[in-house]
Amino acid sequence: MSKKNKKKTTGYTDDHAAAGLDTKFPPIETWRNQFKAYEILVDDPEFTSVCPKTGLPDFGRLTIRYMPRETCLELKSLKEYLFTYRNLGIFQENIVNQVLDDVVKACNPVWAKVVGDFRPRGGISTIVEATYPRQIGRAHV
């Protein structure tokens, strides 16, 4: 392959892609739900993490919306859980999916949705959404 046709790469590796996913996060505690069929929206407007390649901070808004089944998320432990991401090198897409998995593990909701709305980096902003139950292959507009 000539230099002219050489494919450019960003330098991201599989290690970058998996960065942060082996972190031991603190548990998210719960408390017994007393009602049925309502939604809870938890909003973290100052969510921060770190790019695993550059080490630069990422800023955004993280929202967790869910319908509780038997338990609700305890907010102080959730805050401590989210603080774990502050100095953690992890991709934005992985943050949203990891938070969703940990919320589901903690409280087994009827359904849940986590949205990460990250501020622009190089002129491009990112919004990542993950839902439970997972609906793989479903067209989403």
Ranges and model annotations:
Residues 2-138:
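N-terminal intrinsically disordered, cationic/polar leader segments
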